[in-house]
Design a protein with these regions (language model features):
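All-alpha prenyltransferase/terpene-synthase fold signal
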Residues: 1-181
Length: 181
């Protein structure tokens, strides 16, 4: 299960590296440090994000599960990062002028959280479907909290630029529901 968790973290880091690129958020910092494209160049950031995705699946290949369990785990994790349900879909929604906020949150963040809960269950030999809703709900809650932080925090408080959602016209809970919800 540690290998599955590490693979999901590699995918999460890849999504952050890609999200910070100039074609998306053009973030100067991440976690209080220069973003990868600012520190090393845009081409190297793109390749680094891609390499993290490959590394995640190479890491999963090290698991010594039975083939059925491995197949289910690969499907769950690849779905969380792909389209039409995963991180790729969530990133694509940011390019659209009108977006259903719940669908966007489920794709952008809920899919990865769901993969974490489901993959943990599958790796332990349990039924992953029983854990899907928990992951989706945690992901949506996290994304709403992140939307609030983007609107109400300072860069020093959260270690990354703020106000990006509003400046870029991105879907977010504040824009749709207001600060008081």
């Amino acid at each position: 299960t540690d290998i599955a968790a590490a693979s999901i973290e590699f995918l999460h880091c890849a999504s952050l590296v890609h999200d910070d690129l100039p074609c998306f958020d053009d973030a100067a910092t991440r976690r209080g440090m220069p973003s990868v494209h600012r520190a090393f160049s845009e081409p190297l950031a793109l390749l680094s994000g891609d390499a993290l995705i490959v590394l995640a699946f190479q890491n999963l290949a090290r698991l010594s599960f039975n083939p059925q369990r491995m197949s289910a785990l690969l499907f769950m994790i690849s779905r969380a990062v792909g389209a039409p349900y995963g991180i790729v879909a969530g990133q694509a929604w940011e390019c659209e002028p009108q977006v259903d906020l719940a669908h966007y949150h489920r794709s952008k963040t809920g899919a990865l959280f769901s993969a974490a809960t489901c993959a943990g269950a599958a790796a332990a030999g349990s039924d992953p479907d029983r854990w899907r809703l928990l992951g989706e709900t945690l992901g949506e809650a996290y994304q709403v909290a992140d939307d609030l932080r983007d609107a109400l925090s300072t860069p020093d408080e959260i270690g990354k630029p703020v106000g990006k959602d509003e400046a870029l016209g991105r879907p977010n809970a504040i824009r749709s529901l207001g600060i008081d919800g």
